[in-house]
Amino acid sequence: MATLLNIDSNAKTIKGQKQGFMTAILYLAPANSSGVNLCPMAKQAGCEAGCLNTAGRGGISKGSKTFTTPSGAVLPDNTVQRARLARSALFNDDKPAFMAQLKKEITAFIKKAQKKGLTPVVRLNGTSDILWENIPTATAPNIMADFSTVQFYDYTKVYQRLARPLPANYDLSLSYS
């Protein structure tokens, strides 16, 4: 399995290093493109067409080649899209293995950030809207509890999440199309 996290892989997060932060983002296949809906409000919010999934390198294909996802979505044929689908398949099919790999990568990411004198921050919903606060790991009620000194942040269209208790190190911003 390839890596799950993208570390400072876009211009916006690279700029954060000047402010003292190193960012790791998890990009999965959004909405229903993996065959499982990872963005529960995508249809209602009307954001499938404008999704970041095909922005940047995710939108560049080999020539004009495309491929069809398990849900029937047609996407640019590139390694970015195929990696997002592979990550999503692992998440959907073997959550314990996915969470173990995620913990391993966050641990390595923290060490990398600390070596550079930067503060690690993690965004788990780069192109998804998963309720991570409800997904247990082998050792904790959620991934944020496993890394209580690390700041996690996400954007969500599931407004009900903001009315519920969240881990102290998890910041959610409501984002609606």
Predicted feature locations:
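Class I S-adenosyl-L-methionine
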Residues: 1-177
